[in-house]
Curated annotation (Swiss-Prot):
Belongs to the TRS85 family. InterPro entries: TPR-like_helical_dom_sf, TRAPP_III_complex_Trs85. GO terms for cellular component: cytoplasm; cytosol; TRAPP complex; TRAPPIII protein complex. GO terms for biological process: collagen biosynthetic process; COPII vesicle coating; endoplasmic reticulum to Golgi vesicle-mediated transport; Golgi organization; vesicle tethering. The modification Phosphoserine is found at S273, S279, S309. It holds the Pfam family Ig_TPPC8_C. It is found in: Golgi apparatus, cis-Golgi network. Component of the multisubunit TRAPP (transport protein particle) complex, which includes TRAPPC2, TRAPPC2L, TRAPPC3, TRAPPC3L, TRAPPC4, TRAPPC5, TRAPPC8, TRAPPC9, TRAPPC10, TRAPPC11 and TRAPPC12. Interacts with TBC1D14. Interacts (via C-terminus) with TMEM131 (via C-terminus); the interaction is direct and is involved in collagen secretion. Keywords: ER-Golgi transport, Golgi apparatus, Phosphoprotein, Transport. Residues 301-321 are annotated as: Disordered. PANTHER family: TRAFFICKING PROTEIN PARTICLE COMPLEX SUBUNIT 8 (PTHR12975:SF6), TRANSPORT PROTEIN TRAPP (PTHR12975). Plays a role in endoplasmic reticulum to Golgi apparatus trafficking at a very early stage. Maintains together with TBC1D14 the cycling pool of ATG9 required for initiation of autophagy. Involved in collagen secretion. This is Trafficking protein particle complex subunit 8.
Length: 1435
């Protein structure tokens, strides 16, 4: 239980006090009424004695009584009515609420930190009122009157005669059978005569004389002169006198209420009295007080009788709070004791002491002795009951019967003179004067007698008081008999059916157990008495049980919370809304955030309803909000009910302040960080073959890799525009801002271009949500040229659209548990600073065609496609938290976030706006296929644009054509076949012979120092006017790798008028191309060994080309035709085809392979002289009657783009560790000997069957030959991963390695050729030695002087190697030393000697070479490319 202000040792004596009646004359009552008090009320604050009093027990032992309190009340002849008592208790509890600002106790139990009120004053008020309102009962005497004060005034004509009348009236009330109420302790009641004297108006001398007369008649100890009203009421305001009565009078004022629904019920017999008590649910305030001389009307008597039922929980409790409020209001301003001074207070206090010392206590002491003597004489004992107690209770105990074995004898009545009642009467009298030892003895004796007689009501009363007396005995001679209390409670409840007495028993026992820290037993006891017959009592007991659980040594937090919920429920049923709300709030501390979602929902729902009933609308909204924003596990129907309650409450709140700011709505959830902002118009849909550029849209998902590619492309084109330098203030253009983009700067938007904000909603409920009139909330700072700034806040989006137009979504439906985005647009019409604050909308739910609660059309209800049950207008803010800062040490050690300004765009001046459309743009190509499409550029703004460029990472994929495109007319055949190439018709004589042309790479945008990725778009006059459009051809070439390719185009353009904020704009397009296999081309180049017919020193080479058809016919390709092979080089050109016969067909079916061999020669000196102008010589070898001009668009375009992309690939460079620069130069000279700059272009046609039609596709492949003898491919080769190496844990020594050319490079330094007859006939029988002349030609392939050593000696691998059969020897000089100039050819005449016939290899001479100005480290043997075989025959 909660802590109490009083201890149990103080509580029980104050709850059971001697009762004294007061009977006043009318004049005496008038004197006290001058102070707005009755006589009994006048005495109430002074009814406790301030000093100890003494009395002697029957054994003449002195007994000390501490803090004795007496209860004086007017005589009332009607018992209190159950309905009135119930009403009074309700009002007492309602009127006692937690004090505002009271600091609660913080209890820590496990993971819980609970703020719990340490005290429960409402329960203490209820308990006090309940105990003091107990009526006088026949089976006990605790509330029976012990004495009666007869009060008259000194101003009366005959005061003594008035006393006689009052005495007779008291005697008539006590002894007349017409009055069964009130109850009197003994027939000979003490009468105490009090003479009231008004000091301010009365005659003091007369009062003294009357008092002297009284003393002679009634004795000095039986009367008293009480002087009051020392000042007049008109002087009451002159000085402030304390008002000790106000705390006692609130309950009395409650008693004066009317309009109860229970009728009067006058008790006419003792039996009826008992039966009537059975229906009492709880009793309140002091029933002894009432109106003067109204003997038939109890203060709790009901005045109206409309419903005779005594229902415990009738509707009357609903008026408790209001009636209490009215009562308080009526009493406000009344000053009690206005005519009394502090001296009068002391006189009243002295009067109570005199009455107690001289009248009441001697009377009680005398009565105890008389009762003791009566009991002794009746039982025939020789000594007093007190002295015989030990003997009586020590032996031969009567076995107590079980409660279940006893008959229901609660109606058994004893006559007033019965000895059993005399024992009980003596026990009660001893208890009232705190003589607990004697009281316990008497109760114990009476209990035995009652049980023997099976008078269960009497027995239960004796057991109850025996247990209390045993506990209160000084020194605690015996333990507290809790089983007495348990038996008494069970008897009251189950046998006697008297819940009032059972409740009193529980209240006392719980306090006794709590004082012994037996909280578990106390909680069980409190819970046991909860029942359906009284919600108020059950609520209070459950709450105290909850406090027991939390105050245990190991607090039981969840039990505390559960019982607080039960208590709150019963408080709610009892009409105690404030207490119900408090209980639920206390319990919420335990359930909140622990995953008990259903319990949380129930508590919040109840808190919301109770708060709404109490008009705490903000609290109600908050509670309902919590139900909706938490992840609920409720059913859809329940969630719908919650939502409707919330909307109803919310609507009431909003109606209180219709002109106030829009409130925040809890639903639906908004994921602010997922908010995306898009600047610009929506993308146009495809129109037939006309497809708009993909650009940027909110439908695209963010890809960091793609975003980085676009950034690099933009940087690349900006660098080209700014002559290779990226401006310091450059920032990549961002059309779509999201959580991944850089939002640290204010984004730039263009006036008259829409701003789309995508808001991510999520409905956590299982019911539909309908948002109506959904739009953005914004704030705008217009900026004009005068420099004035104006701020306008638009909360209604339709108010002034001339600044910012806003789109309104009339209906936006979100299904249960659905995530859905809404795209809302703003249309800026003025330059300035825009701040997007949030969204505003009406929140409702669909009710179908039904109206809710019969309300019909409410304000805010929407009549549209859906039928709303109810809707409320509100907003939600879009607050986006920026990224976590982690740069400086301070930022790393603290939690700081940067700004996120995606919702704060700056509206800039008008800019051009480009739209790009692609016409006949393919989605599928063969690898290397050439296709012609068209691109349309449209300026849809009011500003001209210029500087249009396109940049792509894949420039080899497309071309707009070079400068030569207009110089080459279309041939008739090309037009007829719709060929993408420029062609001319040739005659048959040119077959297999190269046709020469030339072109400059500058004409195709591949000039020196330029970036091939950035391509200017050839606009007419370089400007596109507003509203103008232009169509340009675009050739496409399928990538060499099969698969799906994503190719990015970035179009860059500027405004003719330079803007300070935005310098350029971009447009993005991503093309998706699916390529399938076509041809694989391999090529190698090697030196020709033939030195004949060579002009000059250029030399010639052979080019071997292998073409394989790798298409698997999935694209419907029947066959490929090789229509032309072209070369492009600054130094070399194809001369003729070597192996093609006239009837050789060049078509390749699936998986077929074709081989070609071509002779390549050096370009003429005139042709090669233009190398500095980036001129390339193109040689075309055609296999048909139509020449494709390879030096024109689009063939040359794609060749140059493939060349530039190849040049971008990292080349293998020699490590530079040599000591001298001359050594490096030598190495470079040697490397150049094996290098070749020859590019092969294979042009083909493919015949495709599609939809029963035959189509002709065209394409080209490129092979770039760089090194003699090294195979090159038209398709990229897979790189093998390097082998794993062991990890080294030491630093390698820095050893300088001399740079040496490779063996292959050295072998290409000198080209050798042997000239000899293939067969030679010699008559060996005539001459044994055969001499054959051989010419050795040496050709210097480098451009430096070379020293050559020719060694003719046979190389032997071991000393044992001898001349074997088939060998020959060289005659003459065995070693030659020569020096060859740059590209010089030298011949040596040699003689070979044979002694046998056979086939011999003449390729045995070894040639060593080194550069003339270098050391011998470069010497190496020159290896012949093929054996030189000679046949020696005998004739």
């Amino acid at each position: 239980m909660a802590q109490c202000v009083q201890s149990v040792q103080e509580l029980i004596p104050d709850s059971f006090v001697p009762c004294v009646a007061a009977l006043c004359s009318d004049e005496a009552e008038r004197l006290t009424r001058l102070n707005h008090l009755s006589f009994a009320e006048l005495l109430k604050p002074f009814s406790r004695l301030t000093s100890e009093v003494h009395m002697r027990d029957p054994n003449n032992q002195l007994h000390v009584i501490k803090n004795l309190k007496i209860a004086v009340s007017n005589i009332v002849t009607q018992p209190p009515q159950p309905g009135a008592i119930r009403k009074l208790l309700n009002d007492v509890v309602s009127g006692s609420q937690p004090a505002e600002g009271l600091v609660a106790n913080v209890i820590t139990a496990g993971d819980y930190d609970l703020n719990i009120s340490a005290t429960t004053p409402w329960f203490e008020s209820y308990r006090e009122t309940f105990l003091q309102s107990m009526p006088a009962l026949d089976h006990e005497f605790l509330n029976h009157y012990l004495a009666c004060m007869l009060v008259a005034s000194s101003s009366e004509a005959e005061p003594v005669e008035q006393f006689s009348k009052l005495s007779q009236e008291q005697h008539r009330i006590q002894h007349n059978s017409d009055y069964s109420y009130p109850k009197w302790f003994i027939p000979n009641t003490l009468k105490y005569y009090v003479l009231l004297h008004d000091v301010s108006a009365g005659d003091e001398q007369r009062a003294e004389s009357i008092y002297e007369e009284m003393k002679q008649k009634y004795g000095t100890q039986g009367c008293y002169l009480l002087k009051i009203n020392s000042r007049t009421s008109n002087r009451a305001s002159d000085e402030q006198i304390p008002d000790p009565w106000s705390q006692y009078l609130q309950k009395n004022s409650i008693q004066n209420q009317e309009s109860y629904e229970d009728g009067p019920c006058t008790i006419t017999s003792n039996k009826n009295s008992d039966n009537n008590l059975l229906s009492l649910d709880g009793l309140d305030n002091e029933v002894k007080d009432g109106l003067p001389n109204n003997f038939r009307a109890h203060p709790l008597q009901l005045e109206q009788s409309s419903d005779p039922s005594n229902s415990i929980d009738g509707p009357d409790h609903l008026r408790s709070a209001s009636s209490l409020h009215e009562t308080k209001k009526g009493n406000t301003g009344i000053i009690h004791g206005a005519c009394l001074t502090l001296t009068d207070h002391d006189r009243i206090r002295q009067f109570i002491q005199e009455f107690t010392f001289r009248g009441l206590l001697p009377h009680i002491e005398k009565t105890i002795r008389q009762l003791n003597d009566q009991l002794i004489s009746r039982k025939g004992l020789s000594r007093s009951l007190f002295s015989a107690t030990k003997k009586w209770f020590s032996g031969s105990k009567v076995p107590e019967k079980s409660i279940n074995d006893l008959k229901n004898t609660s109606g058994l009545l004893y006559p007033p003179e019965a000895p059993e009642l005399q024992i009980r009467k003596m026990a009660d009298l001893c208890f009232l004067v705190q003589h607990y030892d004697l009281a316990y003895s008497c109760y114990h004796t009476a209990k035995k007698d009652f049980l023997n007689d099976q008078a269960m009501l009497y027995a239960a009363g004796a057991l109850e008081m025996a247990a209390v007396s045993a506990f209160l005995q000084p020194g605690a001679p015996r333990p507290y008999p809790a089983h007495y209390m348990d038996t008494a409670i069970q008897t009251y409840r189950d046998i006697c059916k008297n819940m009032v007495l059972a409740e009193r028993c529980v209240l006392l026992s719980a306090e006794l157990l709590k004082s012994q820290s037996k909280y578990s037993e106390a909680a069980a006891l409190l819970i046991r008495l909860t029942s359906e017959d009284s919600d108020l009592r059950s609520a209070l007991l459950l709450e105290q049980a909850a406090h027991c659980f939390i105050n245990m040594k190991s607090p039981m937090v969840r039990k505390y919370a559960f019982h607080m919920i039960l208590a709150g429920h019963r408080f709610s049923k009892a009409g105690q809304k404030k207490h119900a709300l408090r209980c639920y709030c206390q319990a919420m501390q335990v359930y909140k955030g622990k995953g008990w979602s259903l319990a949380e929902d129930h508590i919040n729902f109840t808190i919301g309803r109770q708060s709404y009933t109490l008009r705490q609308l903000d609290n109600a909204v908050s509670a309902f909000r919590h139900i909706l924003i938490n992840e609920s596990k409720q059913s859809a129907a329940q969630q719908g009910a919650f939502l409707r309650e919330y909307l109803y409450v919310y609507k009431n709140v909003s109606q209180l302040s219709p002109d106030g700011p829009l409130p925040q709505l809890p639903l639906p959830y908004i994921n602010s960080s997922a908010t995306r902002v898009f600047f610009g118009h929506d993308r146009r849909p495809a129109d037939g073959e006309k497809q708009a550029a993909t650009h940027v849209s909110l439908d695209q998902e963010y890809d960091s890799e793609s975003s980085q590619q676009w950034r690099e492309l933009e940087e690349q084109v900006v660098s080209v525009v700014n002559k290779g330098v990226i401006p310091s203030n450059f920032h990549p253009t961002q059309y779509c801002l999201n959580s991944y983009s850089d939002n640290s700067r204010f984004p730039l938007a263009v006036v008259e271009e829409p701003i789309t904000v995508e808001v991510a909603f999520r409905n956590p409920l299982k019911v539909l949500l309908l948002l109506t009139d959904l739009s953005l909330l914004w704030k705008f700072h217009p900026k004009d040229f005068s420099g004035k700034d104006n701020e306008e806040v638009k909360q209604l989006v339709t108010s002034e659209p001339e600044m910012i137009g806003a789109e309104v979504i009339s209906e936006f439906l979100i299904n249960g548990e659905e995530s859905k985005v809404a795209r809302l647009k703003l249309f800026p019409h003025h330059i300035g600073e825009l701040h997007i604050l949030g969204v505003v909308y009406n929140l409702g739910t669909i009710q179908g065609s039904m109206t809710v609660d019969g309300i019909g059309a409410l304000p805010g209800c929407h009549t549209g496609k859906y039928s709303l049950s109810m809707s409320v207008r509100g907003k939600q803010d879009l607050e986006i938290q920026g990224p976590r800062l982690n740069n400086t040490k301070e930022e790393k050690t603290s939690v700081k976030y940067g700004p996120d300004r995606r919702l704060d765009p700056i509206i800039t001046e008008e800019m051009p706006l480009l739209e790009v459309f692609f016409i006949h743009f393919p989605t599928g190509l063969l690898c290397g296929e050439i296709r012609k499409a068209y691109v349309e550029f449209v300026n849809v703004s009011k500003c001209p644009l210029t500087g249009l460029k396109v940049v792509s990472k894949r420039p080899e994929f497309f071309t707009f054509g070079g400068n030569t495109a207009v110089l080459t007319p279309l041939s008739p055949s090309a037009s007829e076949n719709c060929s993408a190439y420029k062609t001319v018709v040739t005659d048959a004589t040119s077959v297999c012979t190269a046709l020469i042309s030339s072109a400059s790479s500058v004409d195709f945008g591949i000039g020196t120092g330029s970036q091939p990725e950035v391509i200017p778009v050839p606009l007419p006059d370089t400007v596109l006017l507003p509203g103008a459009s232009v169509q340009l051809p675009m050739w496409l070439r399928g990538p060499d790798e099969e698969g799906v390719h994503e190719i990015n185009f970035l179009f860059y353009y500027e405004s003719v008028k330079k803007q300070p904020k935005i310098r350029h704009r971009i447009l993005r397009h991503t093309a998706i191309i699916c390529t399938s296999r076509s041809l694989n081309v391999r090529a190698t180049v090697c030196r020709s060994n033939s030195l004949e017919n060579e002009e000059g020193r250029g030399g010639n080479m052979l080019v071997f080309v292998d073409v394989e058809n790798t298409n698997t016919s999935e694209a419907g390709v029947k066959e490929f035709h090789i229509v032309q092979v072209s070369s492009s080089s600054k130094h070399w050109k194809l001369q003729k085809s070597v192996n093609l016969s006239e009837n050789k067909d060049t078509k390749l079916a699936s998986r077929e392979k074709g081989k070609f061999c071509f002779k390549a020669i050096r370009c003429e000196k005139e042709e090669a002289a233009t190398q500095s102008s980036e001129k390339y010589t193109f040689a075309d070898i055609i296999f048909g009657n139509e020449q494709i001009i390879s030096s024109a668009s689009p063939c040359a375009d794609f060749f140059y783009r493939s060349l530039s992309s190849e040049l971008k690939k990292p080349q293998a460079h020699l490590p530079v560790h040599t000591e001298k620069q001359s050594t490096e130069d030598a190495v470079r000279l040697i490397q150049k000997c094996s290098e070749v700059d020859l590019n092969i272009v294979i042009l083909w046609k493919a015949y495709v069957v599609e939809d029963s039609k035959q189509l002709i596709l065209e394409g080209q492949h490129h092979v770039i030959l760089r090194t003699i003898g090294k195979e090159a491919f038209s398709y990229p080769q897979k790189q093998e991963p390097p082998e794993m190496e062991l990890l080294k844990f030491f630093r390698p020594e820095n050893i300088t390695v001399s740079s040496r050319p490779s063996v292959e490079q050295l072998s290409s330094l000198i080209k050798t050729s042997l000239h000899y007859p293939e067969s030679f006939n010699h008559p060996f029988h005539q001459k044994s030695l055969c001499l054959v002349p051989v010419t050795l030609l040496l050709s210097n392939c480098s451009k430096a002087d070379v020293d050559v050593i020719v060694d003719l000696r046979h190389k032997t691998t071991s000393p044992e190697a001898l001349e074997i059969h088939g060998s020959f020897t060289w005659l003459g000089q065995t070693q030659y030393k020569l020096q060859l100039k740059s590209q010089e050819i030298h011949s040596l005449q040699l003689k070979a000697c044979f002694v046998h016939t056979g086939v011999y290899n003449l390729g045995t001479p070894r040639v060593f070479a080194k550069l003339s100005d270098q050391v011998t480290v470069f010497e190496t043997s020159q290896q012949n490319s093929m054996p030189a075989l000679i046949i020696i025959s005998n004739v």
